[in-house]
């Protein structure tokens, strides 16, 4: 038995062990069932307090505790932490704001940020907020990976920046050249001062703020556009989504409406953040949440992919977070690491109050392993929360209570209304509320298509109540309306619910799975093996290669899975093991760590063809 098997077995007793208290109110909702079959769901908890703007929030926190560390980042090569305090952040933001105002920038302009998370990136963002100039953080892959810069050009055409910032002039030189061709009047700013014609960020930081900065800050309100975030672009060119201070404030207020206890002013929450600020989770919810809570965030240069997650583990030896949020794939890798390393386990659980995930469903197996580890270290289970939303909506539902159930999307955040609309055999999710954008920037056609006749935004996902007779138990993610497919028999396959169940059934040997079978006679699966599992099989002295051993193991586990599947919509006919890790460059896994089913199937079409070949192609196993 491997250590992972042991952890999962130990977790059988986990339901008898109490959860660590969650500092949030319990579920309380009103459900309205309409004559047309649609269902409206609202929280009975009122929203709490929220800031006027993030610029005002920064000023208030800097005045309250100017010397408290706000953000820390390691020097290159996993060196010592460097930091900026709340007071230093305010002074820097006001200097940058003054520099932008001196250059004539207004709310009709924008500043584009090309590079990944850094202290300098954060200061530029705060400077833009303070000046009332929208900031547009772009996925670094658009500049560094793309050969034609098509998405970079597109994003620039949408927001028409006047200033472009990047951490390194040399690293982003090619992107600068591309953008210069689009607009010869662009001003380039770099943190390292490098780059032909680029202005060092230090020049902006050294600008002395005048009364103009305070005047600009006082014009800010809930209607002010703070930034533009772009959708992932997995099904076309990214769409620019205006993010107002009102949307951000409503998200904070929703969380405050669920707070069950007053924050301890003597406790400074510590967090570790790897997810990119070019997306809603880290860029708005996480970034603003740290400011609101007066916490200290440590920037993590690791990612939940082989070869990079080791950096996250190194950081977790030193940073013991109060809350840890990430993509489901990261929790699987973290469980593997902690099962082998009691020192890491002790550091991770030292201050932890709860964990959170989003963007995909966490498997029951990973949850059980995490809880077994928590019990071994703390004697308690750790609540696992989820928040569900999109670039266009912020977080609109949350699981804010301790529950045995994995896969919930929770219940509406205070102030938000969820509408469930019948769509075939499922309910499509739509949302309205102060956290939702008014539309796409400079794209009225897509804006009109995104909202229904009542003004609800169409999320494109499906959800259902865990218990129709007791909606307070929460809603369950029921797949992407556009991701599900039909077999050639006409039977629907729900990818969003099948995938995590498959991963759990094949634990601890697989990291993730991709499902195929549209218009085919049976479902196929493509698996990524877990690193720990392959290491265990490589150390086994028995006959066969690790891949052959894994194929045999998965064949047995899938045969057992099929016996309880209940029908062709969940039975696996054939599978193949992918020996090449998911590629960020090719879009198979996003910079948030979420697997893109469509991109993976397109890139690995040869493997899909092998699954359905007669006879099966190389490497394909029949269950």
Indicate where each model-derived feature is located.
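Conserved ATP-binding/catalytic segment of the ANL
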Residues: 427-487, 620
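Structural core segment of the AMP-binding/adenylate-forming
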Residues: 2-23, 130-203
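Conserved pre-ATP/AMP-binding loop-to-beta segment of ANL
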Residues: 66-69, 190, 196-230, 237, ...
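Conserved AMP-binding/adenylate-forming core of the ANL superfamily
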Residues: 46, 67, 71-123, 143-153, ...
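Conserved AMP-binding/adenylation subdomain of ANL enzymes
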Residues: 249-270, 277-343
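Conserved AMP-binding A3 loop
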Residues: 82-87, 217-219, 226-253
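Gly/Ser/Thr-rich phosphate-binding loop
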Residues: 293-295, 313, 322-325, 335-406, ...
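Conserved structural elements of the adenylate-forming
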Residues: 90-96, 206-212, 222, 241-263
């Amino acid at each position: 038995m491997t250590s992972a098997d042991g952890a999962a077995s130990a977790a059988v007793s986990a339901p008898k062990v109490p959860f660590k208290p969650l500092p949030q109110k319990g579920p309380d909702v009103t459900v309205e069932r309409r004559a047309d079959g649609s269902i409206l769901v609202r929280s009975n908890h009122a929203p709490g307090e929220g800031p006027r703007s993030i610029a005002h929030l920064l000023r208030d926190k800097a005045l309250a505790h100017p010397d408290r560390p706000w953000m820390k980042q390691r020097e290159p090569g996993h060196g010592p932490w460097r930091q900026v305090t709340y007071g230093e952040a305010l002074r820097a933001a006001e200097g940058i704001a003054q520099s932008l105002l001196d250059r004539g920038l207004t709310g009709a302009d924008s500043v584009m940020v090309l590079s990944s998370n850094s202290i300098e990136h954060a200061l530029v963002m705060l400077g833009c907020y303070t000046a009332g100039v929208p900031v547009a953080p772009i996925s670094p892959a658009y500049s560094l990976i793309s050969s034609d810069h098509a998405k970079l050009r597109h994003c620039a055409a949408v927001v028409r920046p006047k200033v472009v910032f990047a951490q390194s002039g040399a690293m982003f030189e090619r992107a600068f050249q591309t953008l210069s061709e689009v607009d010869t009047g662009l001003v380039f700013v770099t943190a390292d001062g490098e780059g032909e014609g680029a202005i060092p960020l230090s020049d902006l930081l050294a600008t002395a703020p005048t009364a103009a900065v305070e005047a600009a800050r006082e014009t800010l309100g809930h209607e002010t556009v703070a930034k533009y975030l772009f959708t992932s672009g997995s099904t076309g060119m990214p769409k620019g989504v205006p993010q107002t201070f009102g949307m951000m404030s409503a998200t904070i207020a929703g969380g405050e409406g669920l707070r069950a206890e007053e924050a301890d002013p003597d406790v400074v929450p510590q967090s570790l953040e790897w997810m990119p600020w070019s997306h809603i989770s880290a860029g708005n919810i996480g970034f603003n949440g740290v400011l609101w809570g007066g916490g200290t965030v440590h920037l993590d240069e690791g990612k939940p992919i082989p070869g990079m997650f080791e950096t996250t583990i190194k950081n977790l030896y030193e940073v013991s977070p109060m809350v840890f949020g990430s993509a489901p794939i990261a929790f699987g890798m973290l469980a593997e690491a902690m099962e082998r390393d009691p020192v890491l386990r002790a550091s991770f659980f030292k201050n932890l109050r709860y964990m959170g995930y989003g963007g995909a469903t966490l498997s029951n197996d990973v949850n059980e392993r995490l809880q077994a580890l928590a019990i071994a270290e703390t004697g308690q289970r750790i609540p696992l929360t989820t928040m569900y939303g999109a670039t266009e909506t912020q977080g609109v539902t949350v699981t804010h209570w301790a529950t045995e159930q994995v896969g919930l999307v929770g219940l509406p955040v205070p102030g938000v209304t969820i509408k469930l609309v019948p769509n075939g055999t499922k309910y499509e999710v739509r949302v309205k509320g102060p956290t939702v954008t008014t539309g796409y920037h400079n794209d009225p056609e897509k804006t009109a298509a995104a909202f229904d006749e009542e003004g609800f935004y169409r999320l494109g996902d499906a959800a259902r109540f865990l218990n129709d007779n007791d909606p307070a138990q929460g809603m369950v993610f029921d797949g992407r309306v556009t991701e599900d497919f039909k077999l050639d028999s006409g039977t629907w396959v729900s990818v969003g619910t099948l995938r995590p169940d498959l991963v759990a059934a094949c634990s601890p040997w697989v990291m993730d799975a991709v499902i195929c079978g549209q218009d085919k006679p049976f479902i196929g699966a493509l698996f990524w093996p877990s690193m720990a599992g392959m290491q265990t099989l490589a150390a086994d002295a028995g006959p066969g290669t690790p891949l052959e051993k894994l194929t045999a193991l998965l064949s047995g586990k899938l045969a057992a899975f099929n016996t309880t599947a209940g029908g062709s919509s969940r039975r696996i006919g054939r599978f193949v093991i992918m020996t090449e890790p998911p590629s960020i460059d090719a879009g198979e896994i996003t910079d948030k760590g979420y697997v893109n089913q469509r991109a993976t199937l397109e890139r690995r079409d040869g493997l899909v063809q092998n699954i359905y070949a007669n006879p099966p192609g190389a490497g394909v196993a029949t269950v």
